From Swiss-Prot:
Organism: Aspergillus fumigatus (strain ATCC MYA-4609 / CBS 101355 / FGSC A1100 / Af293) (Neosartorya fumigata)
Catalysed reaction, written as an equation: a 2'-deoxyribonucleoside 5'-diphosphate + ATP = a 2'-deoxyribonucleoside 5'-triphosphate + ADP; a ribonucleoside 5'-diphosphate + ATP = a ribonucleoside 5'-triphosphate + ADP
Keyword entries, A-Z: ATP-binding, Kinase, Magnesium, Metal-binding, Nucleotide metabolism, Nucleotide-binding, Phosphoprotein, Transferase
Keyword set includes Metal-binding: yes
Origin organism lineage: Eukaryota, Fungi, Dikarya, Ascomycota, Pezizomycotina
PANTHER family tied to this protein: NUCLEOSIDE DIPHOSPHATE KINASE
Underlying gene: ndk1
Protein name: Nucleoside diphosphate kinase
Gene Ontology biological process: CTP biosynthetic process; GTP biosynthetic process; UTP biosynthetic process
Subunit structure: Homotrimer.
Function according to Swiss-Prot or TrEMBL: Major role in the synthesis of nucleoside triphosphates other than ATP. The ATP gamma phosphate is transferred to the NDP beta phosphate via a ping-pong mechanism, using a phosphorylated active-site intermediate.
Length: 153
């Protein structure tokens, strides 16, 4: 187990549907700590860089267009194994394959409107955080609930 950070984004459909609060609650209730958050309308170039690994896919242009369609709630969460556990909280990329109780299992139907993005590895989390946030935007703080969430520091 390691203490790490992950990048989580609530996509335009999630923002438009008023899901920012419920999604934040899922991460807070699990015991993770929010260290950065902003509502942004990123430029196309930033989205193309974020999804560069998908640039050869037929759905790439549609994905970028969809991500440009409204504001995105960009966040950085911190905690033990937050990358892997965060992906579990989000559910499978295809909402129809997501278990009930996951964000996508509860709030999404179509893969093209799957509400949120989460880093898939610690390495990618670092890249995504650097793409979306300046270092000074990440706030270092100790949650009052830390000792109630973690047995050992």
């Amino acid at each position: 187990m390691s203490n790490e950070q992950t990048f989580i984004a609530i996509k335009p459909d999630g923002v438009q549907r008023g899901l920012i609060g419920p999604i934040i609650s899922r991460f807070e209730n699990r015991g993770f700590k929010l260290v950065a958050m902003k509502l942004v309308s990123p430029p196309q170039s930033q989205l193309e860089q974020h999804y560069a690994d998908l640039s050869d896919k037929p759905f790439f242009k549609g994905l970028v267009s969809y991500m440009l369609s409204g504001p995105i709630c960009a966040m950085v969460w911190e905690g033990r194994d937050v990358v892997k556990t965060g992906r579990t909280i989000l559910g499978a990329t295809n909402p129809l394959a997501s278990a009930p109780g996951t964000i996508r299992g509860d709030f999404a139907i179509d893969v093209g409107r799957n509400v949120c993005h989460g880093s898939d590895s610690v390495e990618n989390a670092k890249k995504e955080i650097a793409l979306w946030f300046k270092p000074e935007e990440l706030i270092s703080w100790k949650s009052a609930t830390f000792d109630w969430v973690y047995e050992k520091a």
